[in-house]
Regions:
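A polyanion-binding, active-site-adjacent surface
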Residues: 1-135, 141-144, 150-153, 159-168, ...
């Protein structure tokens, strides 16, 4: 919430819960859904983040020389809120705090979708899609897709939600999200 002010908000990604594991004694979770730490090298991206990057690369035909920020902070600065339906979990136990966070997430989505219209909500996976009923659909847009972990398990490419998001944003305010920062020199 800190780097994505309410007035600048354009897209809300909703995932499941933070990564429950540690790598080299450091939590993988960063506070942004699907993000990895900035210093994470590509070979060590979490499976979900790798699927997201590969999907964007596939559909945008940028298969080399791209500059992808694994922290996803560049997206956040463009008005993309990377949110999980649960904001914590016990180490090593996926979904362990999901019931505890459900009322908070429900209230957040109800209020957000009522007071900030024209947002694109991207619901990734069945846990996120269970919150669809709390989003005002008369003034907002909803895109649903399987969770990136599914595509990691099946070794398949996510659908082109990136173009769909940008098409909506461009029709609303003339510009989309820059998913990749720029070409490396």
């Amino acid at each position: 919430f800190r780097h994505c002010p309410f007035n600048d908000l354009r897209v809300v990604f909703l995932g499941y819960d933070p990564y429950p594991n540690l790598v080299n004694g450091k939590p993988v979770a960063t506070g942004l859904a699907f993000a990895n730490h900035k210093e994470t090298i590509e070979e060590r991206y979490s499976p979900s983040l790798r699927v997201i990057k590969d999907s964007i690369s596939h559909y945008l035909s940028w298969d080399k020389g791209i500059n992808f920020d694994p922290s996803l902070e560049k997206w956040e600065k463009q008005g993309v809120l990377m949110l999980n339906s649960a904001l914590s979990c016990s180490r090593g136990i996926t979904g362990s705090h999901s019931l505890m966070w459900r009322p908070f997430t429900r209230s957040l989505l109800e209020n957000l979708s009522s007071f900030k219209t024209g947002l694109v909500y991207v619901l990734l996976g069945s846990a996120a899609q269970s919150f669809e009923q709390y989003i005002r659909q008369d003034f907002n847009f909803i895109i649903k897709c399987r969770h990136p972990a599914y595509y990691a398990r099946t070794h398949t490419i996510m659908p082109n939600i990136w173009k769909e998001i940008n098409d909506i944003l461009i029709s609303q305010n003339g510009y989309g999200i820059e998913w990749f920062n720029q070409f490396k020199t």
